[in-house]
A protein has these predicted regions:
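Canonical positions in the second alpha-helix
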Residues: 75, 122, 171, 208-209, ...
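Residue-level recognition of tetratricopeptide repeat
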Residues: 82-84, 129, 178, 182, ...
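Canonical tetratricopeptide repeat
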Residues: 90, 184-191, 222-225, 256, ...
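TPR alpha-solenoid repeat register
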Residues: 87, 132, 180-181, 185, ...
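N-terminal leader/linker segments that initiate helical-solenoid repeat arrays
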Residues: 19-136, 140-143, 158
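Structural marker of alpha-solenoid helical repeat scaffolds
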Residues: 78, 125, 174-178, 212, ...
Length: 338
């Protein structure tokens, strides 16, 4: 009889524990609801320019959110409720609010990352639950992505390029939760990586983009720049050639190819391309200047003084104030006189 009684007591105890954790989840929901009410009131007061009262309402919202966070943290760490999608649904709502409003940032500095993780867990734990709430959850995912974009822009403007890159990668990975590929986010990350000389990261990002089927002139350009910076010259040339095959008229790729071949002292392979660009861009003297530099270089297999002078004269026709063209012409005549 004692064993039966003990079993009944244990079952009752376990039931009470389970109810307690469910209660914490309900508490979190209610505290968050109260916080949202305070936020809405604060926003209305701000429209009326009643900033002091708005600040008080936001402080009340912060208190409610702090309680909501404490309650949902308990539910998220309990063996029974942590395996339920609803727990992580509430968790994501609360933490997204903390991440979105600067007034609540000190409640958790990693709130945005935790929101993304919670949204990911919803799908992992219960795909049917996600489908039932797909509209709402997709909105949260979009909000997280937007937050990452905003954080990335702020980090970039402040010169923290590594953080900016991470933010845009996080934006991409957040959209991937629902099977979407935000390749524009990775493109921004790749561009910043090239600018910041984070060349291995740039190569990794461009590889992902190409694997995703996202082929643009910029992807090939960034890949080539990063490979060249690491002295992977064969890879640099390979990606430039692939890019030119797919986008033969893209001037940025053409210019990158010209720079690459000049760097490798393979100007004979690119001279026709440079001349074509010079004839095409009749108001831009830079291509004739490059031609003049190549033809005027005694170490080049294309060394030709008359062609060099002709090209520099073309530069002066287009831009009479180009001092370097005059200097180089003078240098050629000095060399000839010696």
């Amino acid at each position: 009889m004692k064993k039966v009684t003990f079993l009944v007591v244990m079952l009752a105890f376990l039931a009470n524990v389970s109810m307690a954790q469910n209660k914490e989840r309900v508490n979190a929901f209610n505290y968050n609801k109260n916080a949202q009410s305070y936020i809405q009131t604060a926003e209305q007061l701000m429209v009326q320019n009643r900033t002091d009262k708005a600040a008080k309402e936001m402080n009340n919202a912060k208190i409610m959110l702090q309680r909501a966070k404490a309650a949902i943290d308990l539910a998220a760490n309990h063996e029974e409720t942590k395996v339920e999608a609803k727990t992580w649904h509430y968790y994501s709502v609360i933490y997204l609010k903390i991440a979105t409003y600067p007034e609540f940032a000190e409640l958790d500095t990693e709130a945005l990352e935790k929101t993304a993780d919670a949204l990911r867990k919803i799908i992992e734990l219960d795909e049917s639950y996600f489908k039932q709430n797909a509209g709402e959850i997709s909105t949260y995912i979009q909000s997280v992505t937007t937050n990452y974009f905003n954080q990335g822009a702020v980090a970039y403007e402040s010169g923290d390029y590594v953080k900016a890159i991470d933010c845009y990668i996080n934006a991409y990975e957040t959209m991937a939760i629902v099977g979407q590929k935000d390749n524009e986010a990775l493109m921004v990350a790749a561009q910043i990586a090239v600018m910041a000389n984070e060349n291995n990261k740039a190569i990794e990002l461009c590889t992902t983009l190409l694997n995703d089927g996202f082929e643009t002139p910029q992807v090939y350009q960034y890949m080539a720049i990063a490979q060249g910076a690491l002295e992977n010259n064969d890879a640099m040339v390979e990606y430039l050639q692939k890019g030119r095959e797919k986008f033969p008229e893209d001037e940025a790729l053409i210019n990158e190819q010209i720079n690459a071949y000049l760097k490798l002292k393979r100007e004979a392979e690119i001279i026709d391309q440079i001349r074509e660009m010079a004839e095409k861009n009749t108001t831009n003297s830079v291509y004739y200047f490059i031609l003049g530099t190549i033809y005027g270089n005694p170490e080049s297999e294309l060394y030709n003084v008359d062609e060099a002078l002709n090209c520099y004269n073309k530069v002066i026709e287009i831009n009479p104030n180009d001092e370097n063209a005059y200097i180089n012409i003078a240098g050629i005549y000095i060399d000839k006189s010696n």
